[in-house]
Amino acid sequence: MNKNYDYIIYTDGAYSMKNDEGSFAYVMLDGQMNYIKHFSKKIVHETNNRAELKAIIAAIYHLPEGAKYIKVVSDSQYALNTLSGKMGRNANLDLFDIYDDILSRHDYEIEYEWVRGHSGNEYNELCDKLCNDVLGYDANAEFEKYKGYKRNGKR
């Protein structure tokens, strides 16, 4: 895979069966780790796996025109393994159909990378904060310090 990524996308999803609500979020960076945009959304009547998948699908859908080399970073082994084809797709087939349809319309080369959740990875933590924020927790103040952030050459 080409290590000169056009975009690096960090994603996260969360779901509480107790409250029957959850959220998903992504943070999109350019290949030099400069902030491009973020997105988060509340969902209901879903599952944690669906939240994780929706985060990745939303990010891929919102890639700017001309993108080719993409890195997707997630703490969901389920999402990464099913989307990359390392694991069979037995559930959530509607979401896989959407993902496959998006990919069929573009010439993306996607690398999938797993990161341990809640391990201090700044962008994974930021996605987690965005998920919490959309559910009513205040993560906006925390996000402001990351806006425009550039990390020199580290990926």
Residue ranges and their predicted role:
Residues 1-2, 105:
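Structural motif
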Residues 2-50, 61-63, 68, 155:
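RNase H-like nuclease fold core
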Residues 11-20, 57-130, 134-147:
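RNase H catalytic domain
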Residues 52, 56:
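Short, conserved alpha-helix that lines the donor NDP-sugar binding/gating region
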Residues 149-155:
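Short acidic DE-rich linear segments
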